[in-house]
């Protein structure tokens, strides 16, 4: 198993990061502004383990990758994969949106978790 630091991760979308990772304020990911309907892609090969609507974060997808890594994609306008689906790095999994009560505009909220610990995605991925 290759360490995360040595693994190429696809950016889920390209765009401007408008809200950065901050554990102190419980923002466990980054917000990336993009256009409604832009394609959201998987950062690595993996299996979809959650693909549902939630009141707070709208249409959400979670993908389990090797090395105990989970990627999370929130506020989508549409989910394109079902739970149990195997995806490859770069596969389109959802479309950017503004769904859920916690959304403040069209963007993707993106998180990375390793063994239950949130990681700062900007340490591993260039979004611009």
Describe every region a protein language model picked out:
Residues 1-57:
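Surface-exposed, glycine-biased beta-strand/turn segments
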Residues 20, 51-52, 79, 96-99, ...:
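Residue-level recognition of beta-strand microenvironments
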Residues 31, 62, 72, 95, ...:
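Conserved beta-strand positions that form and line the central face of beta-propeller blades
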Residues 39-48, 81-96:
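Short, well-structured beta-strand-loop connectors
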Residues 43-80, 106-107:
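Zn2+-dependent peptidoglycan hydrolase active-site motif and core
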Residues 85-128:
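Conserved, short, structured surface segments that act as functional micro-motifs
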């Amino acid at each position: 198993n290759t360490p995360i630091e040595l693994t190429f991760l696809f950016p889920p979308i390209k765009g401007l990061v408008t809200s950065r990772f901050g554990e102190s304020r419980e923002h466990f990911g980054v917000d990336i502004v993009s256009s409604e309907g832009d394609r959201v892609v998987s950062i690595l090969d993996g299996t979809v383990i959650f693909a549902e609507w939630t009141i707070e974060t709208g249409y959400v997808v979670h993908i389990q990758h090797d090395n105990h890594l989970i990627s999370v994609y929130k506020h989508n306008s549409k989910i394109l994969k079902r739970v149990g689906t195997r995806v490859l790095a770069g596969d389109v999994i959802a479309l950017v949106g503004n769904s859920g009560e916690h959304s403040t505009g069209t963007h993707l909220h993106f998180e990375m978790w390793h063994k239950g610990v949130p990681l700062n995605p900007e340490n591993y991925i260039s979004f611009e």
